Amino acid sequence: REFAARETELMGEIAIGAGESRSMTVLSQAICTFRERYPKVTFRIFSANADDVKERLDTGILDMGLLTEPVDVGKYAFCRMKEKDRWGVLVRMDSPLAELEAVTPQDLESVPLLISGRESVQRELSNWFGNRWERLQIAATFNLILNAANMVRCGVGAALGFDLNLAFDDLRFLPLSPAMETGTVLVWKKDQVLTPAVEAFHQHIKNVQ
């Protein structure tokens, strides 16, 4: 009875930074089941790319971060998420590309592109494009795909990013061929003093993974 009372009394806020990833669904499900057990714990979610999340982790503003690879986790403790993100391109329905089932580097060579502003991600993309990378037409860079989707809708170009299973009536997502996938890690600073709520959530996410 005392143990059950302690569980219910656990309280506090857990601040998590997260990029746009399918792993956010897994994390959201974990938050839901955690709050069923600890209803007095609240969560603060900060949406940003991995570089911005790491900056806030390092300054102590965030307790944890959901980071898409490639990312240096040397100074963090981490839990690798089971979900992987599939890369592709978001195009308007009236684009000639929308008629394809998948896109190749050659298909995108003459198309204005919107790409991630992260240098580490650009290096990954350059490996996929090979010698065509230097000939690409980069129209804009972005850090959140929803803003990029608005630019696609307005005709700025096609956006390279993850398949987040979002429904756009006037846009279509096409996977890359050859396929390209990216992993995600949930990280927190090594040797940091954890609040009881954060420590309990660390254990919970490991158990549900």
List each model region and its residues.
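Short amphipathic alpha-helical coupling segments at ligand-binding clamshell hinges
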Residues: 26, 30, 104, 124-125, ...
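Short, well-ordered beta-strand segments
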Residues: 13-17, 65, 90, 114, ...
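Alpha-helical segments flanking ligand/cofactor-binding loops in enzyme cores
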Residues: 54-55, 106, 149-150
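Secondary-structure junction motif
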Residues: 111-133, 194-202
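Flexible hinge/capping segments at coil-to-helix
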Residues: 8, 76-87, 91-113, 196-199
